Amino acid sequence: MTKDQMRHALNVIYDQIFNQGQADLLPGLVSGPYIQHNPLFPNGLDGIMGYIKQAKRIPCEVKRMAIDGDLAFVHVRYLDWGGQETAGVDIFRFDMDGKIVEHWDVLQPVPAVSNNANTMF
């Protein structure tokens, strides 16, 4: 597994699967039982695949991406996550073949008003 393989998989997720709604590409990027730490989705692909197919697309902008060993961290601006703009950080663990085997995320709605002039992105 190389950093380029990992970046390629992540670009496919955000550009083609989320932004373009090509959910059928996801199984080719994932291996094993796919451990999911988001409490809204079960382990395995069925939950996230169903969500993507129902949503049709999940418009987003990748702001930052970092890779450390077998982990990748992606700071994302979700333009319409459940009806609202949302800041997210996705963490993916890859196996030796460059396939995703585990996922964590944190999501925070972007507030209409902030107590500082800093953006979330």
Residue ranges and their predicted role:
Residues 1-121:
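C-terminal and inter-domain tail/linker signature
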